[in-house]
Design a protein with these regions (language model features):
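Active-site neighborhood of HAD-like aspartate-dependent phosphohydrolases
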Residues: 2-71
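Short amphipathic alpha-helix with an adjacent loop that forms part of the alpha/beta core around
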Residues: 13-14, 146-152, 207-219
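Glycine-rich phosphate-binding loop signature in dinucleotide/nucleotide-binding domains
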Residues: 16-17, 103-106, 150-156
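Short, acidic loop-to-helix structural element flanking the phosphoryl-transfer center
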Residues: 67-70, 79-109, 116-121
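Substrate-recognition "cap/lid" segment bordering the active-site pocket of phosphatases
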Residues: 115-158, 164-173
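Short acidic-hydrophobic, aromatic-tinged amphipathic segments that line or gate anion-handling sites
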Residues: 134-140, 197-207
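Short, charged, surface-exposed secondary-structure boundary motifs
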Residues: 144-147, 188-197, 211-213
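Acidic, Mg2+-coordinating phosphoryl-transfer loop and its flanking beta/alpha structural elements
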Residues: 158-203
Length: 219
């Protein structure tokens, strides 16, 4: 089933077989998901504690209150995407960096685990942020999708994501893909620390762009 989904995405998106490919996550890479989510739950009287790189277990019912149930947090995330996807602010460094890379011949795909109810809002947000590249909506581990997309080009493929398990999935199924880890929110980035499955980690889009140029555009 997953292989079929991945093949369908690879078939849908046009990829030049001779140019490098950059596959980019959206939340916490292009968009400031965490900052917007904190505002959203704060409006409901909840607070967030940075104890682990997860939402479940870290959203409190009120200040110093008990953690919300996992299903309640899941419902909050769904409601957030349904109502606020268009309002999540972009990382202002992302669009200029991506467009500079595009002008150098890098082709770009946005691979986002966005809920189906928010796909069109995510497209709107990407366009509004001047990130006008194909969006590949996804769910679950990203290894099969990245492998399918990477198989369409002889050029180098680069993958950027904030989630360690996605890097592990890509390392397992597409080890030739160069994996860059990046998290916009500094507290989350510090909390996660070193990601063993990533080839490199960056603290901003300036560093990401340099890594990509050095890997994809130099012989």
């Amino acid at each position: 089933m997953t292989d079929t989904r991945a093949a369908a995405i690879a078939e849908t998106i046009e990829i030049d077989p001779l140019r490098p490919l950059l596959i980019v996550d959206a939340d916490e890479v292009l968009f400031q998901f965490m900052a917007a989510f904190l505002t959203f739950i704060g409006e409901k009287g909840h607070t967030f504690v940075f104890r682990s790189y997860a939402l479940a277990g870290n959203v409190l019912a009120y200040k110093d209150g008990p953690p919300l149930e996992r299903q309640t947090v899941s419902d909050l995330v769904t409601e957030f995407f349904e109502k606020r996807t268009r309002e999540i602010p972009a990382d202002l460094e992302a669009a200029p960096a991506l467009n500079r890379l595009m002008l150098k011949g890098v082709q770009i795909v946005i691979l986002s685990n966005v809920p189906s109810i928010a796909v069109e809002d995510r497209r709107y947000s990407l366009n509004a942020a001047n990130i006008k590249f194909p969006l590949a909506p996804w769910s679950g581990p990203k290894g099969t999708a990245v492998a399918a997309l990477a198989s369409k080009t002889q050029g180098k493929t680069i993958f950027i994501d904030d989630i360690a398990s996605h890097h592990e999935s890509v390392a397992d199924l597409a080890p030739e893909v160069y994996r860059l880890h990046y998290v916009i929110h500094p507290k989350l980035r510090a909390l996660l620390g070193k990601v063993e499955a990533a080839n490199d980690q960056a603290e901003n889009w300036f560093e990401l762009e340099k890594f990509i140029r050095d890997h994809a555009l130099k012989n």
